Amino acid sequence: MSRHPTVKWAQRSDWVYITVELPDAEDVKLKLEPEGKFFFSATSGASKTLYEVDLDLLDSVDVNESKASVSSRSVFYLVKKAESKWWNRLTKPEGKHPLYLKVDWDKWVDEDDEDKGGEGDMDFGDFDFNGLNMGDTDEIGEEVAEEDGDGEGETAAETKEKKIDGEKDEEGVNAKKD
């Protein structure tokens, strides 16, 4: 039997932000269907415990415009709504929502505040959404290598390691002081 990871969500009139909190997720699989069917599964931990989420989203979504990104602590989904409007809840079933489903207050912006430019905490860190299309595949790919100008592709972890070893960061300051 599988377990359910904590799932947080927030929205704008045209997007739904879904964060699955699952550290060290492996074998990540995602299926998103146009009618709003959302399925996630992954394993985590030394015993490779299976975690799954199966949701019927409130309304239709644009699978081709939706994206996903995997980090070491969570899996983030940027789901494009088929119709630009605010949803009064995330899922179709009325009544009590699953205990693992929570509002992401760090990303939440009220409907009235959206026009004022309020974006909440929308810093996605080093998430790389390029090439991650949730509609064409059931699996999320490996970490994409970054170009740092030296012609050699590096993962984000390798780039961070270089900065810690004394290279200058974006502001021209040494990241590590002796």
UniProtKB/Swiss-Prot annotation:
GO terms for biological process: chaperone cofactor-dependent protein refolding; response to heat. Disulfide bonds: none annotated. It comes from the Eukaryota. GO terms for cellular component: protein folding chaperone complex. Residues 112-126, 136-155 have a biased composition (Acidic residues). Gene3D superfamilies: 2.60.40.790. SUPFAM superfamilies: HSP20-like chaperones. Induction: Induced by heat shock treatment. The keyword Plastid does not apply. This is Co-chaperone protein p23-1. Belongs to the p23/wos2 family. PANTHER family: CO-CHAPERONE PROTEIN P23, TELOMERASE-BINDING PROTEIN P23 HSP90 CO-CHAPERONE. GO terms for molecular function: Hsp90 protein binding; protein-folding chaperone binding. It comes from Brassica napus.
